Amino acid sequence: MYAVIKTGGKQYRVSAGDKLKIEKLEAEVGSEITFDQVLMVGDGADIKMGAPLLRGATVSATVLNQARGDKIKIFKMRRRKHYRKSQGHRQYFTEVQIGGITA
């Protein structure tokens, strides 16, 4: 069984037991969270689709970790003008493990 959930402005296809890195959520490590924005649930040939969301469908998950991603470097430059600007960014994320899907 799998589901398509929406969180942090992105959509993820998840199954029970999957580990997932999503945009940062305000939750303690080890706590149980519930995703109620479920777009689709599938089990073999039986597929339920929402318009846009499925009513009563939820996906439960456990928070494994709160961390920051790898550093990306932003570098702007104008040729021949001696203009250089460098900046770095590390995005916060939450790592979760999908527990169960109810439809």
Curated annotation (Swiss-Prot):
SUPFAM superfamilies membership: L21p-like
Keyword vocabulary terms for this entry: Ribonucleoprotein, Ribosomal protein, RNA-binding, rRNA-binding
InterPro entries membership: bL21-like, bL21-like_sf, Ribosomal_bL21, Ribosomal_bL21_CS
GO terms under cellular component: cytoplasm; ribonucleoprotein complex; ribosome
Keyword Glycoprotein carried by entry: no
One Pfam family hit: Ribosomal_L21p
GO biological process entries: translation
Any GO molecular function: structural constituent of ribosome
Subunit description: Part of the 50S ribosomal subunit. Contacts protein L20.
Function text: This protein binds to 23S rRNA in the presence of protein L20.
Family: Belongs to the bacterial ribosomal protein bL21 family.
Name of the protein this chain belongs to: Large ribosomal subunit protein bL21
Organism: Thiobacillus denitrificans (strain ATCC 25259 / T1)
